[in-house]
């Protein structure tokens, strides 16, 4: 998902990272 990649590229993927991980785990 582009959104996920965008979050990872951010300088502070703390909250984003959590969301991505949760999404991945859920999937």
Swiss-Prot record:
GO cellular component: extracellular region
GO MF terms, alphabetically ordered: serine-type endopeptidase inhibitor activity
Compartments in which it is found: Secreted
Main location: secreted
Annotated keywords: Protease inhibitor, Secreted, Serine protease inhibitor
Ranges of residues in domain BPTI/Kunitz inhibitor: 1-27
Function: Inhibits bovine trypsin and human neutrophil elastase.
Record's protein name: Kunitz-type serine protease inhibitor 3
Organism this protein belongs to: Rhipicephalus microplus (Cattle tick)
């Amino acid at each position: 998902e582009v959104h996920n990649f965008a979050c990872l590229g951010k300088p502070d993927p703390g909250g984003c990272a959590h969301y991505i991980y949760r999404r991945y785990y859920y999937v």
